[in-house]
Structures are given as structure tokens and as C-alpha cells.
Amino acid sequence: MQLNVNGAQAIEVSDRTFGGEFNETLVHQAVVAYMAGGRQGSKQQKTRSDVSGGGKRPWRQKGTGRARAGTTRGPIWRGGGVTFAARPQNHEQKLNKKMYRAALRSILAELVRSERLVVVEDFAVDAPKTKALASKLNGMGLSDVLIVSDAVDQNLYLAARNLPHVDVRDVQGSDPVSLIAYDKVLITVSAVKKFEELLG
């Protein structure tokens, strides 16, 4: 299949990487697994056994007329423990490499189908100036965009850093969430070739 390149001749790309069917279930699984892997999972609360104190019973078992109490650290007491206290846990979800790559191929193919993938010969700025990049993107009619190149250009990265709804990634740093989060994905020809190498 062919991909149109802005201001240049169309390039030939593999159907396997950019022309496959959209597998929504697989993409959903990849996105959930990716986001779950970013969760800290270190939340911890104290149960009645973790709270300091409460060893001596507050009053004797019988004779006071009050309900019996064995500790001041039970969940119904102020300063007591939590009934079902949160414990540190690993939220990571396993996703096979083959499935992850298939999900990325599915996303790229859907971007092509929905005309959200903008291919350019090259994309760079001369200096790390946000104004210059904003002007360049406005000229292309892009405001909410992910810029993907084969290697991150320092000037481009610094220029985009202060722009909302604009992100710069290299091919290796692209993930399912970033690829679907933006209205458009601006990608260089060299990045297209690299995606083909990695996912082909």
C-alpha cells in the first residue's frame, strides 16, 4: 500500500504494519496493561493490628454498664485501624510482546484509515523556540498532535515542551496510549520505516 507524504511523493509501506484490521479488544487490552504498569501501587493503610497502642483494655469486662471493649484501636474507635485496609500491590498486567506489537500495528492502521496520520519527509526546528514550532504547526493546521521521529531532536523536544496538546516522541518511545491520545500523529518518513522494521 502507499502512504501520501506532505509535499513529496507517496511512499510504499507494508500492508501488515499500516493496512491491517482494527482489533479493538487487543488495543483495549494493550492500553489497560500499559496504564496499569504505570500505577505506583504503594498505598498502605493500618489495620487494628498495625495501629500503635490499644494493648490494655479501656475498662473492665463487667460492672460498668457499658458495652465490653478489649482495645481502643478497633475500627469503630476514633484513632483506630481501618476495617479493610489498603495494602501495597502490583497492578502490572502481562501482555505478550507479539500481542503488544500487534496492538501497535492495529493502531497505526486505524490512524491511516481515519486520516489521522500525517506523513512528512522531515520535521525539525532551527532553534528551541516554542513560537517557531507553534507557527509551523499552525501552518499545517495541527493543534492537538503527537510528533514521531526516528530519533528525538533536542531543539524540537525543547520547543514542544511548553505547548499544550503537543508531544514529541521517537519510535521506541511511542506507546499505545500516546498514539491514540492525540487528534493527529505527525510522523517522518524515517520513523515510518523504523516502525516497519520493529513491527513488520
Swiss-Prot record:
InterPro entries: Ribosomal_uL4, Ribosomal_uL4-like, Ribosomal_uL4_dom_sf. Belongs to the universal ribosomal protein uL4 family. One of its GO terms (cellular component) is ribosome. The keyword Translocase does not apply. Residues 38-80 are annotated as: Disordered. The gene is rplD. Part of the 50S ribosomal subunit. Coiled coil: none annotated. GO terms for biological process: translation. SUPFAM superfamilies: Ribosomal protein L4. One of the primary rRNA binding proteins, this protein initially binds near the 5'-end of the 23S rRNA. It is important during the early stages of 50S assembly. It makes multiple contacts with different domains of the 23S rRNA in the assembled 50S subunit and ribosome. One of its GO terms (molecular function) is rRNA binding. The lineage of its organism: Bacteria, Pseudomonadati, Pseudomonadota, Gammaproteobacteria, Pseudomonadales. This is Large ribosomal subunit protein uL4. Keywords: Ribonucleoprotein, Ribosomal protein, RNA-binding, rRNA-binding. It comes from the Bacteria. HAMAP family: Ribosomal_uL4_B (MF_01328_B). It holds the Pfam family Ribosomal_L4. It comes from Stutzerimonas stutzeri (strain A1501).
